[in-house]
Amino acid sequence: MTMETISQQQTKFIGHRGCRGTYPENTIEGFKKAIAYGTDGIEWDIIVNKDKEIIISHEPFIDTTYCQPLNKEIGFTKKNLYEMSTDEIKLIDCGGKFYERFPNQEKVIESKPLLVDVEKELLGYEGIVLFEIKSEPSLVTEYYPNPKEYADIIYNHVKNSPLKLNYIYMSFDPEILNELYTLMPKERYVLLEYNPFKCFSKLKESLNFTPHAFGLNYKIITPKFVHKSHKENIEVFAWTVNEIEMSNELIKIGVDAIITDYPNLIKHE
């Protein structure tokens, strides 16, 4: 892909964790609703549990701001998902509790799904799936497997996945991306970053390969960064954009994908 090809592409719109603004995040129904809004793709987050199964979840722990036990009398006996079995995780409701940050979110009892179950429900889906791998070096062994083991778990699952061709792998942790690239050098990867002081060259140097894209907090994206990325055939993804005016500004400077909690509002005109 050349710089000219990149610049001619239409900006893509991606539903962040499904459609978090209106439906509980990282749920099968949320992904389906985002797709129904006409998005170019959806984004989800993955972690690994005690059984070494891949769970769709943004946090490696139970976030009580939006999750609650199905049985309130028993409550939570554990909160670290890496120490919990699949059956234990099914007893967590992450949709029925009022979520102050997203007051218009539909309230429905929803559990954190297994990746394999999401894939079955989305069989035949042709859009993009941004497959974000949650990992923090300081939390490895306590909340996450080490990067090599983590990459092996992901690889052994996705190599036979019906959505394999849809996936674009993302992470804030360059080490997990480097490990995955060793196993799957033909796949697409996105390095995520929120630090405004991390320059283009430092981002590139953290990887052993040239990524498909850099995914930046929209507040730190500049026309200069977009131009420099495109010059090296690297796309730029913006997260998380929830205002139409900001979306339009990012489109003007050539951002390739906009990730939003409100795919019902931030979309193709």
What is the meaning of each model-derived region?
Residues 1-269:
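Phosphate-group recognition and catalysis centered on beta-loop-alpha active-site segments
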